[in-house]
Amino acid sequence: MMRYSPLRYPGGKGKISSFFSELFVANNLIGGTYIEPYVGGGSIALSLLINGVANQIIINDKDRSLFAFWYSILNYTDEFCQLIENTPITIDTWYEQREIQKNKTNAELLSLGFSTFFLNRTNRSGIIKGGVIGGLNQTGNYLIDARYNSDDLKKRIKLIALYKDKIELHNLDAVELIHNLQSNLPNNSLFYFDPPYYKKGKGLYMNYYDDQD
């Protein structure tokens, strides 16, 4: 299975991309539009687009950290790849990137987007709020750079950027996104609703649902 997403994501759905391809075929949606209001790592959306199943993807995430990542790799591709190449993969850098997340509301998008990426690749299970692989003392069986294959990750990002004109990106609440899109979508469109885990969401994601939602 080809991996297109540069992110590791709790609850990632890359393994069921083939199911969605079959769903497009069964419902005569080939060449249509795929919409994901909670994009996260975007594995399914990227697979459908890059393999020519969908002609357009509309991706959205209310979490500004994730929006910043997607915005940055689409609009600052070269700068982002330079950051991957030039940023030391160290505990000191990990602390610096974590500080950026603490001020995510005001952070510049490229800086925030790279911070999201760096922490995703260096934290256990890709959880932004989680602990670093190998621990702060780097005494674990796997160390901070265990999931940080720079060359492969840059290739994925550059491939995604080639499809920029077919990717529509939003930073909205999912309900607001649906209201904004519903009157303008072509008939051959498919929504995929995969909201954050409910019970464990608080520990896994920056944005999540609670009882009031």
What spans do the regions from the language model cover?
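SAM-dependent nucleic-acid methyltransferase catalytic core
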Residues: M2-L23, L29, L74-Y192, P196-G203
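Conserved S-adenosyl-L-methionine
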Residues: I30-D92
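A short acidic (Asp/Glu
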Residues: A45-L48, F69, N180-L181, G201-Y205
